[in-house]
């Protein structure tokens, strides 16, 4: 029964899509193929650049958002929770379209498609990065904070010199996963005319 199911699934998959795909259009052995390949690679470099810039900005913004959640002030804690929950609830495509089309109408401030895409990706990802940083910082045991206090360090110096170096080792895998997520979701910026890999492939 299992083999029959696999056979039916294989036949179904083989029937999907176009059978006349010509992969020789990307062959570097002919002039047209080489041109097409360079065209696709230019989109690939754009995708990688957008992803790296977006993840870098989101890490900085995420850390800024995460720090107030460590405070005992309830207002700051609720502000942090509100930002994270609202931003994570907004679909990325909606955010991209709103920043590129909606923001100029409402405020008169407009950005190029490239900048709009990076802003949208950075804001959307910053909410996830904030939670990653918060979890990483909270994973450091209380004696480490007390050790920083015994050295006469203030809150931010304790965070920078004692806590964050240890927390970063714990959260690196999660940040790596989020980079892969941003790399995949960056394909949505093609909707506002950015020549990334998705748009060039189409």
Where are these regions (language model features)?
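Bacterial N-terminal signal peptides
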Residues: 8-11
């Amino acid at each position: 029964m299992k083999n029959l199911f696999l056979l039916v699934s294989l036949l179904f998959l083989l029937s999907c899509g176009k059978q006349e795909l010509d992969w020789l259009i990307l062959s570097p052995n002919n002039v047209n193929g080489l041109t097409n390949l360079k065209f696709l690679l230019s989109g690939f470099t754009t995708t990688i650049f957008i992803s790296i810039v977006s993840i870098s900005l989101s890490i900085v913004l995420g850390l800024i958002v995460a720090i107030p959640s460590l405070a005992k002030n309830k207002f700051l804690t609720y502000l942090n929770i509100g930002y994270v929950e609202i931003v994570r609830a907004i679909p990325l495509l909606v955010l991209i379209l709103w920043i590129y089309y909606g923001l100029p109408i409402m405020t008169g401030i407009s950005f190029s498609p490239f900048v709009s895409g990076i802003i949208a990706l950075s804001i959307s990802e910053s909410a996830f990065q904030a939670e990653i940083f918060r979890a990483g910082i909270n994973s450091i045991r209380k004696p480490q904070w007390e050790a920083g206090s015994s050295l006469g360090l203030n809150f931010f110096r304790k965070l920078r010199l004692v806590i964050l170096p240890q927390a970063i080792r714990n959260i690196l895998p999660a940040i790596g996963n989020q980079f892969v997520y941003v790399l995949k979701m960056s394909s949505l910026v093609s909707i506002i005319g950015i020549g990334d890999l998705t748009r060039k492939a189409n």
